[in-house]
Design a protein with these regions (language model features):
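Glycine-rich SAM-binding Motif I of class I
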Residues: 458-462
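Signature of N6-adenine DNA methyltransferases within the class I
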Residues: 192, 205-206, 215-282
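SAM-dependent methyltransferase catalytic-core segment centered on the flexible catalytic loop
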Residues: 127-208, 216, 232, 257, ...
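DnaQ-like (DEDDh/DEDDy) 3′-5′ exonuclease domain used for proofreading
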Residues: 1-132, 137-194
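Phosphate/ATP-binding catalytic cores across multiple sugar-kinase/actin-like superfamilies
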Residues: 113-116, 120-123, 191-196, 201-205, ...
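Conserved class I S-adenosyl-L-methionine
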Residues: 447-456
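Active-site-adjacent helix-turn-beta-strand microarchitecture at beta-sheet edges
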Residues: 266-417
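Active-site-adjacent "gating/activation" loops or surface patches in catalytic cores
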Residues: 153-168, 391-430
Length: 494
């Protein structure tokens, strides 16, 4: 709230005034009437109809995001153990010491992620390049953070049990959100909304957030994202084929996929560079010269406004040296073969993709070739499209459907099993491949910081380490996870 006040005060200093608060103290405030005059546009007020996305307790959720806290982050060094909670009998369980605490550049933070996000504002405001979160999906069988009644660490020793009056299991600050709960979507929205607001402030201007979600809350995630980050910064959704066999959780349709919802902090600064080419794609670059491998792209416009009548200035002759294939805009004894952008099937006059000026400046990238069309020999012009331009390898735009076999979420379970030599440690872990695909889309650089505040099995941390090893980069991660007591019969506890 203080930051928002400072921003308004900087933009509209004449709207800053003083008033008396509930304690009788003189405090600075914003004069609403002056602010409305400065904005000088239509303002929706009171009960006037407007388009909005709202739910019960939304105002409290906004206040929760802005409310200050009196907590701090405590380091856990190599030779320390720190109590992080207690079971129903009051028996404490602890976090073990760090590894190379004074030299590591990565952080694993145990605590309520809402509080941690507020604490991170002090050091990481505007410094996080990428955020990935895999929040509770609100399936009716998972848990959401109960921020209003959540049990904080200092209260855990006083708790009398793991179930509330309605029989819902309580684990730390987590509460089961069943469909029988009349506040089913409301509770989930009140959990995620303040966290997204705080997450936005942590992102750098070119930062991006990726949110994994399924059909239960996909619509609400998009609406929330548009409100928090702005509709113009909604980069889209990727359908992730996570379960090729199909989920049996619904009676009518077996779902094969989940979603990856993407928002940028500022779309103009954000760069989604796409993915490196597959071997099949690279094989298209079958020609080579001193500059490297390339493919040939026809210079004639194939789609859109391709007719001469649409763009008459892009219809002009190009002359070709039949011995070398080199081109010129001027006809001569050397450049004697003429090429025109003629549509082959209809023989209509078309257009080139390049203007005369561009051909003059970059003609070294063009090549004339003899071709046969409609039984006759003629000449056409092609562009050399190189696999590597400068020091950048060619990439392909990220697609809206990811269905690679490696993205099957069963692989996440296999990866966890390979790390611990047994299964059952974590349920529904994301595969490292999913995060690696995301990192590749952004072409992460040295010192970029990746945040995951629903860390779970820490797949994101695993992926950052793997990415650094494979690319020789030095990206860093911050993982945040609420400490949870494992059931004594579970594989994770054993």
């Amino acid at each position: 709230a203080d930051e928002n006040f400072k921003k308004l005060a900087a933009m509209f200093p004449n709207a800053v005034t003083e008033t008396i608060n509930e304690n009788g103290e003189v405090v600075r405030a914003i004069d609403k009437d002056v602010l409305m005059q400065e904005i000088s546009c239509k303002v929706v007020d009171g009960n006037e109809e407007r388009y909005q996305f709202t739910w019960p307790d939304k105002k409290k959720s906004v206040l929760l995001a802005n409310a200050p806290i009196n907590r701090t982050l405590r380091p856990v060094r190599e030779d320390e153990t720190v109590p992080t909670g207690a079971d129903s009998e009051g028996k404490p369980y602890c976090s073990t010491g760090s590894v190379d605490f004074d030299t590591t550049e990565n952080l694993y933070i145990e605590g309520d992620n809402l509080e941690v996000l507020k604490l991170l504002q002090e050091t990481y405001l505007g410094k996080i390049k990428m955020i990935y979160i895999d929040p509770p999906y609100n399936t009716g069988n998972d848990f959401v953070y109960n921020d209003e009644f959540g049990i904080r660490s200092e209260e855990w020793n006083d708790t009398s049990g793991n179930y509330d009056a309605d029989g819902n299991q309580i684990v730390g600050a987590l509460e089961k959100n069943t469909e029988a709960n009349g506040r089913f979507h409301t509770d989930w929205l009140n959990m995620i909304y303040p966290r997204l607001r705080l997450a936005k402030d942590l992102l750098s201007d070119d930062g991006v957030i990726f949110i994994s979600i399924d059909e239960n809350e996909i619509e609400n995630v998009i609406k929330l994202g548009c409100e928090v980050f702005g509709e113009a910064n909604h980069l889209g959704e990727i359908i992730v084929k996570s379960n090729p066999r199909g989920s049996m959780s619904t009676a009518e349709i077996a779902s094969l996929h989940e979603y990856l919802v993407i928002f940028s902090k500022n779309r103009l600064d954000c760069k989604i560079v796409g993915h490196l080419l597959t071997e099949d794609m690279s094989s298209e670059y079958k020609f080579s010269d001193a500059e490297g491998n390339y493919r040939l792209l026809g210079l004639r416009m194939r789609g859109g406004f391709w007719r001469r009548s649409d763009r008459p200035k892009l219809y002009y002759p190009i002359y070709i040296n039949p011995k070398t294939g080199l081109i010129s805009l001027e006809k001569s004894d050397e450049y004697c073969e003429e090429a025109l952008p003629i549509q082959p099937s209809t023989m209509e006059d078309g257009t080139w993709r390049w203007s005369r000026d561009k051909v003059k400046a970059e003609g070294h990238l063009l090549l004339g070739k003899s071709v046969t069309r409609n039984g006759e020999t003629c000449w056409d012009v092609y562009q050399k499209d190189y696999l590597i331009k400068g020091d950048k390898e060619r990439r392909t735009k990220a697609k809206s459907i990811w269905d690679e076999p490696e993205i099957n979420y069963q692989n996440g379970t296999v990866e966890i099993k390979s790390l611990f030599s047994k299964g059952g440690i974590f349920d529904y872990s994301k595969p490292v491949f999913l995060l690696m695909r995301i990192f590749e889309m952004l072409d992460l650089k040295d010192e970029d910081v990746i945040l995951d505040f629903f860390s779970g099995s820490a797949t994101t941390a695993h992926a950052v380490i793997k990415y650094n090893c494979e690319t020789s980069k030095r990206c860093k991660f911050i993982m945040v996870q609420l400490p949870e007591k494992c059931a004594e019969k579970s594989e994770a506890y054993k």
